[in-house]
Amino acid sequence: MGIRSYRPYTPSTREHSVSDFAEVTKSRPEKTLVKFRHRKKGRNNRGVVTCRHRGGGTKKLYRVVDFHRNKHNIPAKVAAIEYDPYRNARIALLHYQDGEKRYILHPLGLKVGQLITSGVNAPLEIGNALPLSKIPLGTDVHNVELVPGKGGQMVRSAGAVAQVVAKEDQYVTIKLPSGERRKVRASCYATLGQIGNIEHRNISLGKAGRNRWKGKRPTVRGSVMNPVDHPHGGGEGRAPVGRSGPVTPWGKPALGMKTRKKKKQSDALIVQRRRKSSKRGKGGRQS
């Protein structure tokens, strides 16, 4: 995957860059594996905004991706690599020997025509899914399950990769992309390899309109609103907040207040918390 940049013909193309889609081999999705997905626009079942800055965007068809990899010991041939508008990773179309077709996340290095499989006795090759107990230490994995049989929930974005670092009786310790080290049941499945489209993080949108195409609306500071709209609003000119600390639009403490529950069931499984992100730069620093 490469990145194509544009000359500054207009202000929006000055910093504009897109993927060259060199790895994509098919433009139209498989009709049996797509469905219409109603867009929530940040509302709940009562129509109340629960997540701000969502709405608009282009219409898209949802590709049904197989995160379970539960067709064990049945080889599948990689028929095509496709673009998925709902995620930043590419997806691979599989044709199983029994005639079924499924989408999976496209691992880096997986080519059209290769055969992959899943199961306890699957070979240690890119794209194959195995229980964590069968994966050697130091192996790169993605699409990791948290609950056996529930399907992969972690390490699913473009370029993401986790690593198996330790094994115990019933648990396997993996290092996540955030730097967190976490115990997962040894019977949970994971897929070998790293997610493809690793250059996605280097793409520059170039203009606000590309965020609107994604369904992301502008974020407005509370200090420039009216008092009826935000606790920070009002005053003459650039007025201070008027409180002991910043708060959310609903009056709860914000910016630094810890929101994680003190007694969380997964605390016993987290060996090392994720590294703190730097506020000054894009990168992170280890704690």
Swiss-Prot record:
Keyword Ribosomal protein among UniProt keywords: yes
Entry's Gene Ontology molecular function annotations: rRNA binding; structural constituent of ribosome; transferase activity
Record's keyword terms, sorted: Ribonucleoprotein, Ribosomal protein, RNA-binding, rRNA-binding
Entry superkingdom: Bacteria
SUPFAM superfamilies, per database record: Nucleic acid-binding proteins (SSF50249), Translation proteins SH3-like domain (SSF50104)
Any Gene Ontology biological process: translation
Residue ranges, annotated region (Disordered): 209-287
Record's keyword annotation contains 4Fe-4S: no
Pfam families referenced in this protein's UniProt entry, alphabetically: Ribosomal_L2, Ribosomal_L2_C
Biased amino acid composition, Basic residues: 209-219, 272-287
GO cellular component terms, A-Z: large ribosomal subunit
Record's function text: One of the primary rRNA binding proteins. Required for association of the 30S and 50S subunits to form the 70S ribosome, for tRNA binding and peptide bond formation. It has been suggested to have peptidyltransferase activity; this is somewhat controversial. Makes several contacts with the 16S rRNA in the 70S ribosome.
Family that this chain belongs to: Belongs to the universal ribosomal protein uL2 family.
Quaternary structure and partners: Part of the 50S ribosomal subunit. Forms a bridge to the 30S subunit in the 70S ribosome.
Protein's recorded name: Large ribosomal subunit protein uL2
Lineage of producing organism: Bacteria, Bacillati, Cyanobacteriota, Cyanophyceae, Oscillatoriophycideae
